């Protein structure tokens, strides 16, 4: 697909639904797996996904972050990520946060035992909170800036649009025979 949308209804398809999905099938008419965590009422409309080790393994295409984003997920917190998936998250406006396994275990315990448990992420301060601070997380300053400013690769390029146009104009003056026709 060349569109970045429409993947959310198929996120975790084999776990969310009890039947076999097909391209073009109306997912609203499919049999829901009521036991799957993201189908539970208490997790509806959540924007932070907590996960375990090596999250995103096998998801080397950008379709995986597109599906998460389309589903409403803006942050994924896990003890580790597949490398390509991790990079693709940043390219698509999702914040992947890596925390130690012991901290993740504590978060999972709280989520399972406390109905209404919520966590928030403060990207600027690089902190995760519930009733108190859970953890500080590290993030590359450039990637942080891009997420804070809502910039993807194209947006970054367009920030320099005037400089690029000026360069192209001067370049064509110096090398007029290279100008396309």
Predicted feature locations:
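Cytosolic catalytic domains that perform sulfur/thiol-centered chemistry
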Residues: 1-52, 56-181
């Amino acid at each position: 697909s060349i569109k970045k949308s429409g993947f959310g209804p198929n996120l975790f398809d084999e776990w969310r639904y009890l039947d076999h999905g097909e391209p073009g099938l109306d997912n609203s008419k499919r049999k829901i797996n009521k036991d799957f965590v993201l189908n539970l009422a208490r997790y509806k409309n959540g924007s932070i996904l907590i996960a375990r080790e090596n999250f995103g393994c096998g998801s080397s295409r950008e379709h995986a972050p597109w599906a998460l984003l389309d589903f409403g997920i803006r942050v994924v917190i896990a003890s580790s990520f597949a490398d390509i998936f991790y990079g693709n998250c940043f390219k698509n406006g999702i914040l992947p946060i890596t925390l130690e396994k012991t901290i993740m275990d504590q978060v999972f315990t709280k989520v399972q035992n406390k109905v209404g448990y919520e966590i928030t992420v403060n990207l600027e301060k690089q902190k995760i909170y519930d009733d108190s601070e859970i953890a500080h997380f590290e993030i590359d300053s450039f990637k942080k800036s891009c997420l804070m400013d809502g910039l993807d690769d194209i947006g970054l390029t367009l920030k320099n649009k005037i400089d690029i146009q000026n360069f192209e104009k001067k370049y064509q003056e110096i090398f007029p025979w290279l100008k396309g026709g």
